Amino acid sequence: MSSLLTIHDLVEGEIIKRPSKYIKTPYVADIEICSNSQLILGHTASLGCCGLADVGAHVLMAPVPKTKKNTNSDKLHCEYRVYLSIIREKNTEIIVGIFPKLAEELTESALKKNLLSRLCNVKTYKRETTIYAPGLVDSRFDFSGIDEKGLPFIMEVKNVPLADYEDISAKERKKMCFDDRDINSKVAYFPDGYRKKTTDTVSPRALKHLNELSLIKRMSKTRCIMCYVIQRTDVDRFQPSVIDPEYREAFKEAVKSGVEIITMVIQWSKDGDAYFVRDDLPISI
């Protein structure tokens, strides 16, 4: 496996309270460092990540770089940032990347190292391109560039930290038993998260990106690519989640329109090393 990046100085902690007792925001948690029982404030970027960074979760975090703002201020601030979550199941540890920005960094590293089979030897690329067409498209996409054949491409990256034996609602999951299932037979799914109504789309922004890529593809010769970065290895397939029918239908339409799908699997170690596993995890739709 090829190495993509390393997060240095990781320490393990257990989330004690979230939101923090001291800073009332869901992005800050009170975390106890496992090695010395010290209680610290940790920044968690992903609103609990559906249990992966909630109370009781074991996480891996790194010190937040010191700046003039947080060293000269008397105000409380986060000393650590949470990057990874540790799942313990059937005497096995699975390390899951939950910091959203990691997905873009991992994708860029894979792009530079020619590991993405659909985007080898690109001539040029850049991060964060805004595309605007009045009444049609108005979004910032993660990558754009020129491929090895001289064709322009746009690529949007989505972080996929979640997986389960079946992609079903929490209510249905309580009725099922997965004790006899292979631990590595889970389905990775996107999107998932909080919403006020079950009929709402989970991520309006993600839906907008997908629909706009479909539109751009239909209107031009630009290659439009969705890259789903699956930051765990206990999976054997990916699918647009059944809990968001609107996104699921948009995904199907995007594929029909010619939008290319990359499903990149990443393996993390407790030392903070990230490795490229594959970019063609089977898709179920």
What are these regions (language model features)?
Residues 223, 233-285:
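N-terminal targeting/trafficking signals and adjacent low-complexity tails
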Residues 19-21, 88-101, 117-177, 202-211, ...:
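Active-site metal-binding core of divalent-cation-utilizing nuclease and nuclease-like domains
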Residues 47-61:
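Short nucleic-acid-contacting surface segments enriched for D/E, G, S/T with interspersed K/R
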Residues 69-94, 98, 279:
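OB-fold/S1-family single-stranded nucleic acid-binding modules
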Residues 19-22, 62-71:
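Short, charged beta-turn/beta-strand-edge "cap" motif at the junction between a beta-strand
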Residues 176-245, 265-267:
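Nucleic-acid nuclease catalytic cores
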Residues 21-30:
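Short aromatic-glycine-enriched beta-strand elements
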Residues 6-21:
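Structural detector for short beta-strands of small beta-barrel domains
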